[in-house]
Amino acid sequence: MTITIGSSTFDNVFYDVDVDVLYLHVGDPSTAVDFDESPEGHALRFDAGGRLVGVTIVNAKSLIDREGEIAITLPEVVHVGSDTVGPALAGV
């Protein structure tokens, strides 16, 4: 399964249903060398070239259920709907 958010396509997707955390990464998570947090509180990971390679979304399903989408600033605000992350949150 892949999930595309903005201009990044994440091919390493894991949803931890027990804690409602969605982990997204491009390839191997160990390529991340720099870390930041979006204004919404999502963890952002970047490679040595400054390219976004990972996003961790806490309360992913809760946000979709409550807001209908997940807002992520990367640096532009991207709105991610259930059509994008729904399969991952359903464990498909």
Where are the predicted features?
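Short, compositionally biased leader-like segments
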Residues: 1-22
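Short, solvent-exposed secondary-structure boundary motifs
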Residues: 1-8, 31-37, 80
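Phosphate/ribose-recognition catalytic cores of enzymes acting on nucleotide-derived substrates
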Residues: 10-13, 44, 69
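Peripheral terminal and inter-domain segments
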Residues: 15, 43-44, 88-91
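N-terminal intrinsically disordered, cationic/polar leader segments
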Residues: 19, 25, 31, 91-92
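Amphipathic, hydrophobic secondary-structure cores in small proteins
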Residues: 25-62
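A short, polar/charged loop-to-alpha-helix boundary motif
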Residues: 62-75
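Cysteine/selenocysteine-centered motifs that mediate thiol-based redox chemistry or coordinate metal-sulfur cofactors
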Residues: 78-92
